[in-house]
Amino acid sequence: MNSREIIFERFIAPLKKKRCNYIGIEIEMPLVNLNGKTDKAVCTDAFARATERFGFMPRKFDDDGVCHEAVCDDTGDVFSFDCSYNNFEISLGRVRTLHEAQARFRDYVGFINNILSKNNHTLTGLGVNPNYKINDYNFVPSPRYRMLEGYLKKCRIWNGPFHPFFGFGTFSSASQVQLDVTEDDLCETIEAFSLVEPLKAVLFANSYLPEKPELLCARDYFWERSPHGINPKNVGFFEPLPKTVGEVTDYLSKASIFCTERGGKYLFFYPIPFDEYLGLDTVGGEYYDGEYHACSFAPEAEDIAYLRTYKQIDLTSRGTLEFRSACTQPLGEAMTVAAFHLGLKGQTKELIALLKNSFLYRESGSPAQIRQKMNRADRLSTVDEEKLKALLTDVLSLCRDGLRERGYSEEIYLSPLFERAKTLSSPSRRLLRQNDIKKIVREYACL
């Protein structure tokens, strides 16, 4: 098979299967020591106790024998440390309603924070760990994370407009949602959610970075200005927006692969567009075995399993779209991100019509350009506030209609977003107004 056929089988063929409209939710949370640097022993102890309390089975261990991933066979829920022992992730197994997700999430976080509080630590709802300057920058010492660390550190060597935070994954946290999608709905869904991305920046910004004070959400900056962003097709938006499944296939065939496995070892290399990669005889890369070693290998069609993009909206190999751009939210409002996407998923035609006819797209540019503007701390000096409030309220009302049609009373999770729309506020803006990080950490940790 050629690269296009391989892409089709990996990403498009799963869309043809019958969909059950499940919801997938992943929430990363910074582990914060209110007294200073995070204590790894405190974090791993809380992880171990939660694993035992909820009947999870240890699944992955680091090079020192410390468990960094555990799974519940009954629910499919996963506890893990994401990139570092400062970043805890709860990946909820497939659920049919947000109430199921909320109940399990609250149980897990409530138990873990009760343990952490005894050592003045907490999980909190921030997109950037406030102690990132003093915390341990080391990645989890495991094969996959050793590979990722080596790759991201290449920002020090390769040419590019890279930021200096190669370890951004160790201190940045996101709230990600996966929803089933069909082949027929794929392009329309990508278009609708691409158009609404600028408004998500207004509602969900929660990753303030003092080194970039002009940004309320540093997520785009972290990903796009890292080695992941060498090929624009691996990050950001689908540009131009695809109109057919064939265009999606062509687009993904030009996304870059940067890692694979050989002989049980992860290899990484300078990113290569997949359609070019398969035509190469050999590729030079590196692997970790006590230290990083140079190597060369021959590309194989099976390496498609390692092709991964980090876009605002990603098409996965499981027949889902993953929405990646939202920062972790205050934990008492954790379901707002999933509720927003779930409610709009069945309203894509209406959403497209609403946004295309709005002042936002009549007066401005592409979704990417408008999101950049909406991400700025000085945004309100360049945008008509009343028009923006009205548009946000219209989009949220459409979302509420979509949730009501589901019939599970899930629209209750939108209440914080309606409040944010009224004031054009976000968790980042609240943080800046408060100017008391310990108070914000405690407030955003409350369930």
Segments and roles (model prediction):
Residues 1-89, 93-94, 168, 184-191, ...:
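C-terminal accessory/tail domains of diverse enzymes
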Residues 91-102, 178-180:
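The substrate-binding groove and active-site-proximal loops of carbohydrate-active enzymes
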Residues 105-119:
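Hydrophobic alpha-helical hairpins/lids featuring a short glycine-rich hinge
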Residues 116-132:
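Carboxylate/His-rich catalytic cores and anion/metal-binding grooves
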Residues 130-137, 185-186:
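Short, well-ordered, mixed-charge alpha-helical segments that flank or form enzyme active sites
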Residues 135-150, 219-230:
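Short, low-order "capping/linker" segments at domain edges
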Residues 141-166:
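Acidic, His- and aromatic-enriched active-site or binding-groove loops in soluble protein domains
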Residues 169-175:
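Short, conserved phosphate-binding/catalytic loop or strand-edge motifs used
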